[in-house]
């Protein structure tokens, strides 16, 4: 679950 949350944050940063 932690990995998924971190991935979402990374995607938002790139966007």
UniProtKB/Swiss-Prot annotation:
Glycosylated. Keywords: Antibiotic, Antimicrobial, Glycoprotein, Protease inhibitor, Thiol protease inhibitor. Belongs to the cystatin family. This is Cystatin-2. Stable in the pH range 4.0-9.0 at 37 degrees Celsius. Stable when incubated in the temperature range 25-75 degrees Celsius and pH 7.5. One of its GO terms (biological process) is defense response to Gram-positive bacterium. Inhibits papain, ficin and bromelain with an IC(50) of 0.079 uM, 0.099 uM and 0.125 uM respectively. Has antibacterial activity against Gram-positive bacteria S.aureus and S.hemolyticus, and against the Gram-negative bacterium E.coli. Reduced antibacterial activity against Gram-positive bacterium B.subtilis. No antibacterial activity against the Gram-negative bacterium P.fluorescens. It comes from Capra hircus. One of its GO terms (molecular function) is cysteine-type endopeptidase inhibitor activity.
